[in-house]
Amino acid sequence: MYSNENYAEEGYEDYGYDAGMIDDGYDRSYYPMHEDVKKFLVYFSSVIKNGVVYEIQNLYENTFPKLSEQHFEKKAWPSEEEVAHLVDNDSLFMILYKELYYRHLHARIQKGPSLEQRLNSFYNYCNFFNHILPSKEPVQLELPDIWLWELIDEFVYQFQNFAQYRARLSDKSEEEMDMLLNNNSKVWNILCILNVLHSLVSMSKIKDQLEAAAAGRDPEEVAGEFGRHSFYKMLGYFSLVGLLRVHSLLGDYHQAIKVLEPIEIHKKSQYSHIPACQISTSYYVGFAYMMMRRYSDAIRTFSSILLYIQRTKQLYSARSYQNDQINKQTDQMYHLLAICLVLHPQCIDESIQQVLREKNYHDNMYKMQCGDLETFRNFFVFACPKFVSPVPPPSDAPIDDYVKEALEHQTNVFMDEVRQQQELPTIRSYLKLYTTLPLLKLASFMDHIPQDEIGEQKIENLLTHLLCFKHKMKNIVWTKGASGLEGKFQSGSELDFYIDKDMIHIADTKVSHRYGDFFIRKIMKFEDLNRRLHNLK
């Protein structure tokens, strides 16, 4: 749908901003700034100016959230005018401060930001990208990786949030409608978002670096002047994940996976040290695989990241404003995994199975296996991303709420696929009981009527379902390489069959667990540990 060919060769387009154009309209009664907040802002400005990354990270991850809880739980941080004179009108710090300011508004203010604030936030991002992208040499700015990830993630989130806000015409005043439809057509425009993310990827040469690393070469050789700096390199990497998310929100799942091609999705890398980034990547990759009917790849993606979350949750449980998002995405991935296991049964790790049992997913999985379409729909609507339309409603559209149109479209696409497979779990359950089974007998089981009442049409319908079973159980499965789109056709069913005249011949293809290899590895590991302990003596 959207690819690199859509963008101008000169790269990033500069969206100017007249600072006096919009009055930040948040209704914030004046109150004196607390002394702790003043000291924090002055010190924060100082460490950013001096590039003390460790201290910046400490202030960003710990002090800022703590002060937000203490003084600004349900109100905005001090305005730009109140802060600027404290930091000697440091323009770069003010851009970074306003990024946190508007992020706080989106996260904490119950009624949400006003239209003016949404526009101001967009122009502030423009100022930031105008500062780092058109530069002829790398800017002297160092920020911790967690901030860079959350900056890109928030940029995409605010685009998504604005697209939904823009589609909700029923609660807008005439003035807001005029501002949205006539005066701000480029604000949070999809091409602008893609333009920024692709420009960051291009400037950092992150794809070349990832390909060089995969080939065993030094990424520095191809990084270029900008890509050698951690600031640009990590922004480029996180922008790839941002593009994955944007294309998923638009329903372009092929492009979502394709944009990650330099990244070996199923392998850990030096870039996977930000838990929220790794979890978000797996969520959108797994969802894209599911919508492309690549259930084996989706199950492997979800199972792998859910195991990672189980084992590392204590490491990040008290970090970052994104913890609520991580917890929600974890719950969503269990729902998506349950859907995939119903549509494409296969063995998964026992600890994941245990969670599915403990949280009562099995009851709903049983309903889905019995063809309960409403349960499928409920699971999908809860677990899917908040889809958006790339374009606003037309200016002459009736005043209505269009925000659910994108979700309803994707839900209908998914439910069409489910309806095609509705009879397959029942067919599978009967086939597993036999090695040979007459077509007439299976048709009788399926329709719950005596065999002598089965007509030709019933047999034809059954043959259609059996052909569907063969087709749906054959999927492309990733085997190796950096492209998540490539793979080999494999049968995902634990049984196979062929039809000879009026008889179905069934073979169980389930591979038994090889416990011997597991114990051999553990014994060898124990012997190695024993040798090391003896050497210490």
Swiss-Prot record:
* GO molecular function terms noted in the UniProt entry: translation initiation factor activity
This protein's superkingdom?
A: Eukaryota
Q: Please name the SUPFAM superfamilies in this protein's record.
A: TPR-like
Q: Does the keyword Methyltransferase apply?
A: no
Q: What is its main location?
A: cytoplasm
GO biological process, alphabetically ordered? formation of cytoplasmic translation initiation complex
- Pfam families, per the entry: Paf67
Q: Taking every annotated instance into account, which residue ranges of this chain make up the domain PCI?
A: 301-513
- Where are the annotated coiled coils located? none
Q: Name one GO cellular component term.
A: eukaryotic 48S preinitiation complex
Record's keyword terms, sorted: Cytoplasm, Initiation factor, Protein biosynthesis
Q: What does this protein do?
A: Component of the eukaryotic translation initiation factor 3 (eIF-3) complex, which is involved in protein synthesis of a specialized repertoire of mRNAs and, together with other initiation factors, stimulates binding of mRNA and methionyl-tRNAi to the 40S ribosome. The eIF-3 complex specifically targets and initiates translation of a subset of mRNAs involved in cell proliferation.
Family membership noted in the UniProt record: Belongs to the eIF-3 subunit L family.
Assembly: Component of the eukaryotic translation initiation factor 3 (eIF-3) complex.
Q: What is this protein's record name?
A: Eukaryotic translation initiation factor 3 subunit L
Q: Provide the species name.
A: Aedes aegypti (Yellowfever mosquito)
